[in-house]
Swiss-Prot record:
Modified residues (N6-acetyllysine): K101, K476, K491
Pathway(s) annotated for this protein in UniProt: Metabolic intermediate metabolism; propanoyl-CoA degradation; succinyl-CoA from propanoyl-CoA: step 1/3
Protein family per UniProt: Belongs to the AccD/PCCB family.
Official protein name in the record: Propionyl-CoA carboxylase beta chain, mitochondrial
PROSITE patterns: COA_CT_CTER, COA_CT_NTER
Gene transcribed to yield this protein: Pccb
Assembly mode: The holoenzyme is a dodecamer composed of 6 PCCA/alpha subunits and 6 PCCB/beta subunits.
Organism annotation: Mus musculus
Record remark on domains: The beta subunit contains the carboxyl transferase (CT) domain.
């Protein structure tokens, strides 16, 4: 495996050397120098391609990790990478850092631009073989330069993070470098997509840049995100915790929600990142790419007519509905292991990218809670920022009750999802498959939050609450509870009261859902919304 990786590294290095030649520098008149300018350039370039040297490259491979340049080679289209600042070196003179042995062309990060499936992207890849990928002033300067360029031309930024943190020898200059990067992250937010792929350690101040980007992915077993490491935690709180427990991929994809997905290894992560990139527009001013679609837009889906159980309390898998409706069952789920009671992700309808949001009856009956509300809100806001239409599948019995939720701030966090849907001006299509109870009905992209098209299936139950709870209030003391429940269901727990009032646009046959959505998306493609001017909104953070 290591040998194969080395071969790829050499090949990648050769391609990079070719791409970076043609600088137009002449050596005429310099023959008296011991080493010509051209030879010096070649030597510097060769040193840059080797990073921290073969010994450190081998150590990187033994950890099951690719080098910074190998990662770029796998991520980008062959021959498309145009490197910048290959000759930049750190400026630190303290602690022996001025010695030639501590100078590496390019320092500890590789930066530049390239293409993924022919589409422009800017990339930085931290090089753990050089000072552990630690961030120096020069390192930060290189990253900031490509981020500025990406904002200027309107292209995404992908960061491949593998760094031990700030370079201690540089002191405050390293901290200033982090702040410079954070500022670019904020400036670029909502302008260009920003993606972080954590492929090694990422600790201390370094963690805030991935946290500010739109999506954070991790590699299992080799990547870590934490503000303070296990040793500091032990000294301060007396907790014994491993790196993996504290900030590993499992922790951040299942417990904290900091990371959006985790992949098995570097190769798997980079291949998935290429696929994910295909769903995204280059900027907020550009449409998402359109893929040729061989899945008929008017395709009927007969299995949807029986997917919702007749028993209102029986669970089913919302993913079965999503996969059946979208193009070729291709769904890139975001945060699949976190807050599983809501499903979010990207798909295509008739070749065009859409954002999917759906309650998951298989988990907590699809109730909204703190984590699912925050997960859904962040996804909805990303889609709105980058003009990606939203399709929402609703089966929600309400917000999860209990002191843990109330003490945790479910009111404030639940309001985030409501706010996100209300704020969104992209095309919004909602399908109520079964339950839509109480305030959760309002929150899930209802007509009242300016949903463009709102459908209900015949199995929909749109009401203030479920029949049992309602009967206990309305028919308190009533002798025939079953009759009372039947009366409530007849009057309220069905799609007709909402349809009569225009709160749903139509009650549709489930099998026609794909055809109806594709047709609506075509009509809504020219949608324009004008809102009152404001400096910025104040979402309940």
């Amino acid at each position: 495996m290591a040998a194969a990786i080395r071969i790829r590294a050499v090949a990648a290095g050769a391609r990079l050397s070719v791409l970076n030649c043609g600088l137009g520098i002449t050596t005429r008149g310099l023959c008296s120098q011991p080493v010509s300018v051209k030879e010096r350039i070649d030597n510097k370039r060769h040193a840059a391609l080797l990073g921290g040297g073969q010994r450190r490259i081998d150590a990187q491979h033994k950890r099951g990790k690719l080098t910074a340049r190998e990662r770029i080679s796998l991520l980008l289209d062959p021959g498309s990478f145009m490197e910048s600042d290959m000759f930049v070196e750190h400026r630190c003179a303290d602690f022996g850092m001025a010695a030639d042995k501590n100078k590496f062309p390019g320092d500890s990060v590789v930066t530049g631009r390239g293409r993924i499936n022919g589409r422009l992207v800017y990339v930085f890849s931290q090089d753990f073989t050089v000072f552990g990928g630690s961030l120096s002033g020069a390192h930060a300067q290189k990253i900031c330069k490509i981020m500025d360029q990406a904002i200027t031309v309107g292209a995404p930024v992908i960061g491949l993070n593998d760094s031990g943190g700030a370079r201690i020898q540089e002191g405050v200059e390293s901290l200033a470098g982090y702040a410079d990067i954070f500022l670019r992250n904020v400036t670029a937010s909502g302008v260009i997509p920003q993606i972080s792929l954590i492929m090694g350690p990422c600790a201390g101040g370094a963690v805030y840049s991935p946290a500010l980007t739109d999506f954070t992915f991790m590699v299992k077993d080799t990547s870590y995100l934490f503000i303070t490491g296990p040793e500091v935690v032990k000294s301060v709180t007396n907790e014994d915790v491993t790196q993996e427990q504290l900030g590993g991929a499992k922790t951040h994809t299942t417990v904290s929600g900091v990371a959006h997905r985790a992949f098995d290894n570097d190769v798997d992560a980079l291949c998935n990142l290429r696929e994910f990139f295909n769903f995204l527009p280059l900027s907020s001013q550009d449409p998402a790419p359109i893929r040729e679609c061989h899945d008929p837009s008017d395709r009927l889906v007969p299995e949807l007519d029986t997917v919702v159980p007749l028993e209102s309390s029986k669970a089913y898998n919302m993913l079965d509905i999503i996969h059946a409706v979208i193009d070729e069952r291709e769904f890139f789920e975001i945060m699949p292991s976190y807050a599983k009671n809501i499903v979010v992700g990207f798909a295509r309808m008739n070749g065009r990218t859409v954002g999917i949001v759906g309650n998951q009856p298989n988990v907590a009956s699809g109730c909204l809670d703190i984590n699912s509300s925050v997960k859904g809100a962040r996804f909805v806001r990303f889609c709105d920022a980058f003009n990606i239409p939203l399709i929402t599948f609703v089966d929600v019995p309400g917000f999860l009750p209990g002191t843990a939720q109330e003490y945790g701030g479910i009111i404030r966090h639940g309001a985030k999802l409501l706010y996100a849907f209300a704020e969104a001006t992209v095309p919004k299509i909602t399908v109520i498959t079964r339950k839509a109870y109480g305030g959760a009905y309002d929150v899930m992209s209802s007509k009242h939050l300016l949903g463009d098209t709102n459908y209900a299936w015949p199995t929909a139950e749109i009401a203030v609450m479920g029949a049992k709870g309602a009967v206990e209030i309305i028919f308190k003391g009533h002798q025939d509870v079953e009759a009372a429940q039947a009366e409530y269901v007849e009057k309220f727990a069905n799609p007709f009261p909402a349809a009569v009032r225009g709160f749903v646009d139509d009650i549709i046959q489930p099998s026609s859902t794909r055809a109806r959505i594709c047709c609506d998306l075509e009509v809504l493609a020219s949608k324009k919304v004008h809102r009152p001017w404001r400096k910025h909104a104040n979402i309940p953070l």
